[in-house]
Amino acid sequence: MPITSSPDLFYLNDCDVVYWYDLTRLVCHYVNLTERDLLANEREKFLTSLDLLTAQITYVYMLFRNLRLVEDSFKKTLKKLIYTLSRFSINANIWFHSTLFEEREAIASQKDPERRSPLLQSILGTFQKFHFLLRLLHFLSNPNELTILPQLTPRFFKDSFNTISWNNPFLRKRLNQHMSHDLPRQMIKAVAGASGIVAENIDEIPASKQGTSCSSETSHHSPSAPFQRRRRGTIFSNVSGSSDESDTIWSKRKKPYPLNEETLSLVRARKKQLDGKLKQMIKSANEYLSNTANFSKMLNFEMNFKTYEEVSGTIPIIDILENLDLTIFLNLRELGDENRVFDEDVAIDDEDEEFLKHSLSSLSYILSDYFNMKQYFHDVVVKFIIVAQHLTLEDPFVFSPMQNDLPTGYYEPMKPSSLNLDNAKDKKNGSQNTDIQEEEDEYEPDPDSLILFHNLINQDSDFNDLKFFNLAHVFKKSCDDYFDVLKLAIEFVNQLILERENLLNYAARMMKNNITELLLRGEEGYGSYDGGETAEKSDTNAVYADSDTKDNDEWRDSQVKLPRYLQREYDSELIWGSNNRIKGGSKHALISYLTDNEKKDLFFDITFLITFRSIFTTTEFLSYLISQYNLDPPEDLCFEEYNEWVTKKLIPVKCRVVEIMTTFFKQYWFLGYDEPDLATLNLDYFAQVAIKENITGSVELLKEVNQKFKHGNIQEATAPMKTLDQQICQDHYSGTLYSTTESILAVDPVLFATQLTILEHEIYCEITIFDCLQKIWKNKYTKSYGASPGLNEFISFANKLTNFISYSVVKEADKSKRAKLLSHFIFIAEYCRKFNNFSSMTAIISALYSSPIYRLEKTWQAVIPQTRDLLQSLNKLMDPKKNFINYRNELKSLHSAPCVPFFGVYLSDLTFTDSGNPDYLVLEHGLKGVHDEKKYINFNKRSRLVDILQEIIYFKKTHYDFTKDRTVIECISNSLENIPHIEKQYQLSLIIEPKPRKKVVPNSNSNNKSQEKSRDDQTDEGKTSTKKDRFPKFQLHKTKKKAPKVSK
């Protein structure tokens, strides 16, 4: 059974023949083309067309055999068809070789068929018979027109080969772990069927028939797995991927190169080392061009040696290009895919979905250019080596007869509509010929060479141009290409770095921390996040038991002086950090420290009660506290020691337990902490026992327990009420909307910024610590309750403001009005900065740097430079480099001033602190090895989370002393609703300025450019020609050139 030409099975070309009628149309077209070339007296074109027609007839014959069309009518027609084609070919060759060109021209130009040569009439008659037989064959096979044909032209199976000689992670299988075999299922079935093996299930196929795994494919990782790379094609690559493949060079680097400035510096440093040698080689070639008398074989060998030395120095650059960490772009593709492979319950709303798809479609062109550059880099290096080898040969084209005269893809099928007289000749000559005049440098040819050149022309029409006689010229051109491609590599690495930063910056400014986390999933270095200057380095999984501070030693000494029955039992299981805080410990040790009455640690108490749910379940936590309340006395105590233990330890611990419980239920209780097993603890009974024992605070504890668990209904500790102004905003009273350019420009920027600040600060004050924890923990520890309503409202308001700003600009058709709007919004952003409203300021500049606005060249030209400089300074303040270092320094200088901070920084800090640090510490005792990985809680991670939460709460304490304008607040709130998302705005942007050429950058010195930088230059108009010019093809065989006119 033949293997059918299925798009699901092979990497097919657009012009591949799949159905019978496709082949029939293609054959008929070549028949017409052959006849036309014959009558046009174009011998070269005719031979090309006849050759291609013969190949198609051969395919027809093969198809009849593979499809087992064995009827007698088919056989007879095929035999006659092949016989007629042979006669036509012989007679046509006799016609072209037995008659002079002028005679053929005169005969072919005769319109009266009877006045033509008998030989030509015989040839045309034979061809008419061929026409008839072909139509007859088509008629006989008409019932099989829609039959899928067997695959005749060589094609690669899908998912079994990368189709390239360098590393491209985007061509890897996405779900390798779900594959039952190393080779694709459909490929196994197809090959098994062709081999005569019938198996409905792949597992039924014998193991010996399955083949071996393709190392070039199976070694590839899923987007979140560690990279395992082979150094592919420093020059050569083994593409077969079979088990008996030859040895290849494996990269010694185990980790990929990150997309950052350090990697770019490595490439630049390597290029700088190569530039000096390369310039010297170009200089030597120029000297030889200027004076051929200096030619010597020794000089050629020296240049050859320098070439190999240069290429050896290029290997690190190729290694970097092959091992760049593109995980963020892989994750972007997976997130934009409907069948995404992330195991987590990823909640992506419509706005995020649109943002991801827009980013993916925009970045795809840049990534495509990057891979084209990689291929061009490999091509240039290969050509550089071959040209250098030519220098050592007496005749540099001595191996030319070994090469195929036909270019690659000569017999590839083409669309019939694209086949004409001109491109048929181009197909013969190859599509790689470029303008010779652009490639040649001017130099005076040697007179003797010219004489020999003309003699060769008279003897053979297939000749070389003047470069045949001057290899130094070819070598110099190769050096120039090599020099240029090194610069091109640096340019593309830098562009990928910027695109990565822009993608993360936009996500951060839009406060999409969940998207940021998923984009960075699996990236090398993900998790080692530094939340700021004061934060400690990320925790490692290994700590040492003797990492105590001096203060801790003194406190421990005081504990040692106490009687054994008054000492804490689990002190040895506490780990102290350098900042005199608890870094980690066992659950028992942490609870013991929490309930100790001698050394109160308020920060520890707050941190524990806020983050306890990441350590215990609610029932487990309260059970530990009840156990502490009911401490058992140590053994072998006398009466006096027992009384001392009760007085100095038991009663203080009981008071401390009641105090912790009361504080927990009163200030830190959250509805999501409720669990079915809580009822088994009988908390009301526990509180009543404490009252009977006259424990301080027990009455208040019972009151809190009854309030929280009254009538079986769990109630939250606090029920924040929304302010009147927010209720007004949410009711959407009918009022004036800022829906026109005139209405927006009519509002004073100071008034607009003031009311924005009032509105956003009120929403900010509604954010609770539980909102923040729910945002980063999701449903990891607690049930979803409310889904962070306060925080979601704040983020939604900022994103709506961004969409409103950008939409207000792109919907305006008049360029001058758009320029006024841009200036107006820049002034509003500046006043927001003066009011310390960094949230609104960031939302506005994010809109102005978004792709629909950033690409408006003519509009930005109409904005005065001073205003653009103002936007530049605002954007520089929110530069995400070094983790928003400029913004963080500005925030620290505010002290007690009112402020609406940019929440995206807090979300990033919370997300990366939680995801980038382990939940548990591994305790190592010197050389004794590792013990119990999950025994010691990483409490330092929880402390850092609380540090961030405290800063969030700090800015809720100080309020603005501004006068509210309810009309403006109402209009702002209502105007932010029902705004089109970024994709729709981008289409409007293309309408108002459809063909941008050169982008006017409002912030030319900042790296925080829109992630759509130069994207408009990559639209469909002119994209193909740009790529073709940027990555020119070259040929390693003889250069063809149109011959000078020679008298016939």
Swiss-Prot record:
UniProt KW Acetylation keyword: no
Domain Ras-GEF: residue ranges: 748-995
GO terms assigned for molecular function: guanyl-nucleotide exchange factor activity
Compositional bias annotation for Basic and acidic residues: 1010-1032
Pfam family, one: RasGEF
Domain of life (superkingdom): Eukaryota
Comp. bias intervals (Basic residues): 1035-1048
Domain (N-terminal Ras-GEF): residue spans on this chain: 578-710
Keyword field contains Cell inner membrane: no
SUPFAM superfamilies on file: Ras GEF (SSF48366)
GO biological process: cell division; small GTPase-mediated signal transduction
InterPro entries named among the record's database cross-references: Ras-like_GEF, Ras-like_Gua-exchang_fac_N, Ras_G-nucl-exch_fac_CS, Ras_GEF_dom_sf, RASGEF_cat_dom, RASGEF_cat_dom_sf
Biased composition (Low complexity): 212-224
SMART domains: RasGEF, RasGEFN
Region (Disordered): 208-242, 419-444, 997-1048
Keyword annotations: Cell cycle, Cell division, Guanine-nucleotide releasing factor
Record function comment: Promotes the exchange of Ras-bound GDP by GTP.
Name of protein: Putative truncated guanine nucleotide exchange factor SDC25
Gene name linked to the record: SDC25
